[in-house]
């Protein structure tokens, strides 16, 4: 059940437009919300402000559609909630995603922003001065006046100058050259719970200008446990959150933990088994080229399939056997139309196996997702660290399918 409120700031009009507010939210928390920015409020000249306005309007459109999707209960069997896959083992486990308090708080934060857009806008900027986020360049940038104005360092420049591994460079070159085709086209389609399209097909300035980070490309000890095709074929962008365009520290005196953005992973790749101390979710927005193309494995930290091999006051080291008989049943297939929403509780071990053999032009295709983390404000849990698992037999090397896998799980503090 929902009731009606009014809000401004939609892309297509300055007129107040009716919006449905989920009934688990308190109107008093939404109306006239007070925002404290993370860092200084960005300042722009009148000439530059026109580009910020375009980017802001597309950001509001993205956030509003995301919140509406999460609270869409038309076909979920839930109340004010979409349904999410949370564990792929033992036939798969699901839950009403809005049963989680962290998700309720994130949706509240989004409605506080879109219903007080003018007040929240003071915390919004292009982050054109940040050196570690990049533009995909190419056709995506050439079609966006905002991205051209920001003029970020491009993926091409990044892979040429900052990536030293030659194989990763080659994967990065292909990723860069095909990025526009990966995020646009008819196979990019929103799940049915979304009220409208928020892909690069509909919001070209946001997708070109958000600021992308190929987070695994550079050399690091962590990437010894990664695959080169992921290092050169994966990137994410954040539009709302500590590292994003909209950086809010507090709303009404309460810390904001939401991080909302998008991810792109090239096909023919296995995003390695990993975990983190912060809950995370994905909405798949790709129509698959064949059945079982997009496979996810998610195993919760208290699963009977996991055994503890070592622990101290901060970390629990665990193992599980991905090579056991019928291990393929630990994976579930998804798409924009089947199990489109996945939610990973803190310390859920997960991986994404993306097949490309059924694609006519696999170099031009990727899985594209709406992405979010919900409680990133609690720094006690080292929210920014994604911990890659490793081979139990060969520690320090990537964990492959078909073997015993070893992971370090953070002892989460509440």
Curated annotation (Swiss-Prot):
Coiled coil: none annotated. Gene3D superfamilies: Jelly Rolls. Keywords: Lyase, Periplasm, Signal. Belongs to the DMSP lyase DddY family. Catalyzes the cleavage of dimethylsulfoniopropionate (DMSP) into dimethyl sulfide (DMS) and acrylate. Its main location: periplasm. InterPro entries: RmlC-like_jellyroll. One of its GO terms (molecular function) is lyase activity. Induction: The maximal level of transcription is observed under anaerobic conditions in the presence of acrylate or methacrylate. Anaerobiosis is necessary but not sufficient to increase the expression. It catalyses: S,S-dimethyl-beta-propiothetin = acrylate + dimethyl sulfide + H(+). It is found in: Periplasm. One of its GO terms (cellular component) is periplasmic space. Its EC number is 4.4.1.3. This is Dimethylsulfoniopropionate lyase DddY.
């Amino acid at each position: 059940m929902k009731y009606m409120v009014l809000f401004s700031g939609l892309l297509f009009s300055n007129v107040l437009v009716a919006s449905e507010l989920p009934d688990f939210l308190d109107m008093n928390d939404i109306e006239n919300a007070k925002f404290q920015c993370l860092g200084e409020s960005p300042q722009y000249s009148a000439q530059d402000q026109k580009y910020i306005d375009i980017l802001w309007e597309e950001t509001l459109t993205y956030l509003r559609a995301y919140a509406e999707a999460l609270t869409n209960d038309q076909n979920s069997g839930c109340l004010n909630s979409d349904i999410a896959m949370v564990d792929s083992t033992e036939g798969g486990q699901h839950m009403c995603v809005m049963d989680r308090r962290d998700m309720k708080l994130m949706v509240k934060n989004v409605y506080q922003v879109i219903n007080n857009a003018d007040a929240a806008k003071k915390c919004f900027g292009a982050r054109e001065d940040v050196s570690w986020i990049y533009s995909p360049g190419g056709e995506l940038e050439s079609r966006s006046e905002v991205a051209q104005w920001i003029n970020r360092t491009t993926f091409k420049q990044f892979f040429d100058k900052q990536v030293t591994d030659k194989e990763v460079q080659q994967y990065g070159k292909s990723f860069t050259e095909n990025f526009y085709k990966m995020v646009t086209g008819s196979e990019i389609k929103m799940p049915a719970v979304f009220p409208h399209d928020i892909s690069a097909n509909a919001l070209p300035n946001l997708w070109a200008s958000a600021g992308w980070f190929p987070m695994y490309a550079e050399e690091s000890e962590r990437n010894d446990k990664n695959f080169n095709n992921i290092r050169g074929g994966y990137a994410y962008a954040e539009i709302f959150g500590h590292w994003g365009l909209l950086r809010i520290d507090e709303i009404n005196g309460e810390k904001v933990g939401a991080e909302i953005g998008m991810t792109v992973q090239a096909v023919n790749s296995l995003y390695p088994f990993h975990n983190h101390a912060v809950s995370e979710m994905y909405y798949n927005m790709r129509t698959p080229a064949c059945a079982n193309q997009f496979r996810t494995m998610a195993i919760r930290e208290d699963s009977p399939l996991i055994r503890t091999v070592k622990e101290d006051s901060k970390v629990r080291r665990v193992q599980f056997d991905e090579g056991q008989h019928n291990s393929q049943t630990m994976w579930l297939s998804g798409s924009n139309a089947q199990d489109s929403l996945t939610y990973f509780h803190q310390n859920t071990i997960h991986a994404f196996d993306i097949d490309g053999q059924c694609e006519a032009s696999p170099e031009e295709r990727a899985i594209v997702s709406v992405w979010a983390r919900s409680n990133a404000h609690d720094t006690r849990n080292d929210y920014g660290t994604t911990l890659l698992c490793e081979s139990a037999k060969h520690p320090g090397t990537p964990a492959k399918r078909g073997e015993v896998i070893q992971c370090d799980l953070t002892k989460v503090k509440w």
